[in-house]
Curated annotation (Swiss-Prot):
UniProt GO MF annotations: ATP binding; protein kinase activity
LysM repeat extents: 177-217
PANTHER family the UniProt entry points to: LYSM-DOMAIN RECEPTOR-LIKE KINASE-RELATED, PROTEIN LYK2
Source organism (scientific name): Arabidopsis thaliana (Mouse-ear cress)
Binding positions for ATP per the UniProt entry: L330, E331, I332, Y333, A334, F335, E336, E337, L338, K368
The protein's name in its UniProt record: Protein LYK2
Extracellular domain ranges by topology: 26-241
């Protein structure tokens, strides 16, 4: 009896201890992305303690041009900065003016971050490259749940900064700079035209720490190269105002009659367009009819907006205002406008297939003719997300032109000046005779890596909104004037009617995010080798009904994937035009990504998020190496971009 009770007691005790152990291992619902261990250092160790003689100052912070901050407009959109006050060296460093204030005992500058879907406290801090910390963001926003970050959420940020101490430093500005892995005190002194002693003194007699901010002392205000001063004298301003007033009066009198006449003609034309459009929409499906609620004619602004859910945003003083955030909608063009833009759809403006080049109001466009069935199957619902309009890596749909039921309609896309990726890696530009003869049309290794990164970012965006592209290939990757990649055919996955076998549907038949990933792996192979997979395998395009060819393809494909996993044999498939001007380690990592993406089992392939992170690390490594080269030949903050458009016209939809 006693033995039985003892066994029951021991069994219960073991169960209780096991429960407690498992409970301690399980994650809590209040977990955050911040890691306190990584940010345990005090701000004072980096020289940010307030000085009693200076409570605030105007200074600057620096960001490197990388996602999500590519340009001036990115900073203005994400951080709410005034575009006219930003100093942006294209492709190099972004210089941000800030007001540094003493908050308690520590200097900091306040900014507001406009969140997007997928943001976390950690991702925001990482995007700012050490100017703030994950824990600081969480402390400054105690009432905002990290799990609910998304569009229209405003985060308050405390940017690290400092003011020069009178009598101690001769510097007029202490610029906050994110230290890179390859930065050193000596290299920073050369880049910013200062001394090593001044940098060490400004940072509490210590050196610089990679991936942490450092203070760079400058004795003058950084200025944009070639900038023009905008400080005319009072006399000049008065004269300018008088000239404007006189010109306005004359223009008003002379244009009154003209305005009345053309106003009537324009109203009549607009009425005809809207009547024709509504007639077309009334015969379509409910989703297309819903789009009519967002349609504006060309007499309106390029971007119109609709209200958000909360109906409030922060104004310039960071207070809640009544202005309603809005979403971009499509523009509707009259058929006569497209005729004029394309010179009556002349052969000289024909790009390929049903796509024409057009120029309207000084803007280059790609205009695609589509039949009624294609227009009906176009996924207009994707365009309701404002992130589509601001996405740098997707060819944007700008507008439409609806015609009669029995006539073809048109989709209007942004125009990519430098053709498709296929044109470049297959060296077809010479055949098209659309390149500048003095230029050698060739993609360098670093440019190829950046294009792979751009496509990965586009896939990450599309899969985040649960959209499967279904037609990812080098012919549908286009290059803008800066040779950055943009994915075409967005919204047309239901319009694809290709009957020929492709590499991915020889292995699997259903469309899914994994099939897009497979297609991405094929593009990476083309970038590496300068050849199509068919050329690498020694095969030709065949009909999908050929079972023997399918078995041969799968066998040869497995052999090619094994080749990508061998660093020595990889040289055999590298594009010969690259010569030795590429990193073997970088090429092997890209080949590994291609190999992982084309795994036979869909569940074994990485996600678009994983791919973007892996390629991003390669881009960062290349940029760090390039920074070292820039230091040797430049001593200023700002340099001009050397990229030039090489192609006159390019297709948007293949």
């Amino acid at each position: 009896m006693a033995v039985s009770v003892s066994k029951q007691y021991m069994t219960s005790l073991v169960v209780i201890l096991l429960f407690i152990s498992l409970s301690s291992l399980s994650p809590t619902s209040t977990s955050h992305s911040c890691d306190p261990v990584e940010e345990e250092e005090e701000a004072s160790s980096f020289g940010y303690v307030c000085h009693s003689n200076l409570q605030k100052c105007h200074t600057f912070a620096i960001l490197r041009a990388k996602p999500p901050f590519y340009s001036l407009s990115d900073l203005s959109r994400h951080l709410g900065l005034d575009a006219d006050d930003e100093y942006v060296p294209k492709g190099q460093l972004l210089l941000i003016p800030i007001e540094c204030r003493c908050n308690g005992s520590i200097y900091e500058a306040s900014l507001i971050k406009n969140c997007v879907k997928g943001d976390t406290f950690r991702s925001v801090s990482q995007s700012l490259q050490g100017l703030t910390t994950c824990l600081s963001i969480r402390e400054k926003n105690p009432h905002i749940s990290e799990d609910k970050l998304g569009d229209n959420i405003k985060l308050r940020l405390a940017i690290r900064c400092s003011c020069p101490q009178e009598g101690v430093s001769n510097a007029s500005f202490l610029v906050t700079y994110p230290v890179g892995v390859r930065d050193s005190v000596s290299s920073l002194a050369v880049r910013f035209n200062t001394t090593e002693d001044a940098i060490v003194s400004a940072n509490n007699k210590s050196g610089v720490v990679p991936l942490k901010p450092a203070l760079i002392p400058l004795d003058h205000k950084p200025e944009k190269q070639g900038s023009r001063k905008r400080n005319p004298s009072k006399k000049k301003r008065s004269k300018m105002k008088l000239m404007i007033a006189v010109s306005s009066a004359i223009a008003g009198v002379c244009g009154l009659v003209t305005l009345m006449v053309f106003g009537y003609l324009h109203w009549k034309k607009e009425t005809q367009i809207q009547t024709q459009t509504q007639k077309w929409i009334s015969n379509k499906d409910p989703e297309t009819r819903q789009l009519s609620l967002s349609i504006r004619t060309t007499s309106d602004k390029k971007i119109s907006f609709e209200g958000s859910q909360d109906g409030s945003i922060l104004d310039s003083h960071n207070t809640v205002g009544t202005t309603t955030p809005r979403k971009p909608v499509l523009e509707i063009y009259a058929f006569e406008e497209l005729e004029k833009a394309t010179e009556n759809f002349s052969s000289s403006n024909h790009i390929k297939g049903s796509v024409y080049f057009g120029s309207l109001k000084g803007k280059d466009l790609a205009i695609k003719q589509v039949n009624a069935d294609e227009m009906k199957r176009f996924d207009f619902g994707l365009l309701n997300d404002q992130s589509h309009y601001y996405n740098h890596n997707v060819i944007r749909v700008l507008g439409t032109c609806f015609r009669e039921i029995d006539q073809d309609s048109y989709l209007v896309f942004e125009y990519a000046r430098n053709g498709s990726l296929w044109d470049w890696i297959q060296n077809k530009l010479a055949i098209k005779n659309q390149f500048i003869e003095s230029c050698y049309c060739f993609l360098a290794w670093k440019q190829r890596i950046k294009i792979c990164h751009d496509v990965a970012i586009a896939l990450k965006y599309m899969h985040r909104i649960n959209y499967v592209h279904g037609n990812i290939k080098s012919r549908n990757i286009f290059l803008n004037e800066d040779l950055r990649g943009k994915v075409g055919n967005f919204g047309m996955s239901k319009c694809v009617t290709n009957e020929l076998a492709t590499e991915e549907n020889l292995i699997e038949s259903s469309l899914s995010p994994a099939s897009d990933i497979f297609a991405y792996g094929i593009i990476v192979m083309e970038v590496l080798s300068g050849q199509t997979p068919d050329m690498l395998l020694g095969l030709q395009e065949v009909e999908t009904t050929s079972l023997g060819t399918q078995e041969t393809f799968v066998s040869e494909w497995s052999r090619l994937r094994r080749l990508l996993g061998d660093k020595e044999k990889l040289r055999e498939v590298m594009d010969s035009t690259l010569g030795e001007s590429y990193s073997v380690d970088s090429a092997f990592e890209i080949a590994s990504i291609a190999r992982d993406c084309t795994a036979e089992e869909a569940e074994s392939r990485p996600s678009a998020v994983e791919i973007a992170e892996r390629v991003s690390r390669l881009v960062d490594d290349d940029e760090d190496e390039e920074d070292e080269a820039v230091i040797d030949r430049e001593s200023t903050l700002i340099s001009e971009s050397s990229y030039k458009p090489l192609v006159k016209k390019s297709s948007i939809i293949d």
